[in-house]
Regions:
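Short, flexible helix-loop junctions that flank or precede catalytic/ligand sites
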Residues: 1-147
Length: 147
């Protein structure tokens, strides 16, 4: 009987070096990894995972994340204060997709230019709102089913 290996790894939250390193290694080995990280934006989430993983993996952490990362979904919920207390909440999601080692997101990860990713996700989210991804968007193109 052949050995079985799980195809998907769910990790509730990455908060320490050991977990970050294991998440990066699993993703680098082709496993679909779904996890959460607390951060202010998609770049901050990636930076947090890379920074934590680097403590045990060294410089290979950024390269591994750059090659393995495919999708980041950043969610935020804010509440406005009203005269009766707290008003209605506002939900916002930002999507950042990467299509592997040659994608601009991967280049930013390897170079450590995390703040420069904002332009990439801004353009991607405009295309998502218009339901139009380009073939060069790779993952987004597949998700939106554009022909």
């Amino acid at each position: 009987m052949p050995a079985s290996r799980p195809a998907i790894l769910y990790i509730g939250e990455v908060r320490d070096t050991e977990t970050a390193a294991e998440v990066v290694k699993a993703a680098s080995n082709g496993m679909l990894v779904i996890t959460t990280v607390h951060a202010g934006d998609p770049a901050g989430a990636i930076l947090r995972v890379v920074s934590l993983a680097e403590q045990s993996m060294g410089d290979t952490a950024a390269v591994s994340v750059a090659q393995a990362l495919r999708l980041v979904v950043h969610q935020s919920l804010s509440f406005a204060k009203s005269s009766d207390g707290w008003g209605r909440g506002h939900y916002e999601a930002i999507v950042l997709a990467s299509d592997g080692a040659s994608h601009p997101v991967a280049n930013h990860i390897r170079k450590g230019t995390f703040p420069n990713m904002r332009e990439v996700w801004t353009q991607q989210n405009i295309r998502i709102k218009n339901c139009r991804a380009e073939p060069a968007d790779g993952v987004l193109h597949a998700l939106l089913g554009n022909k």
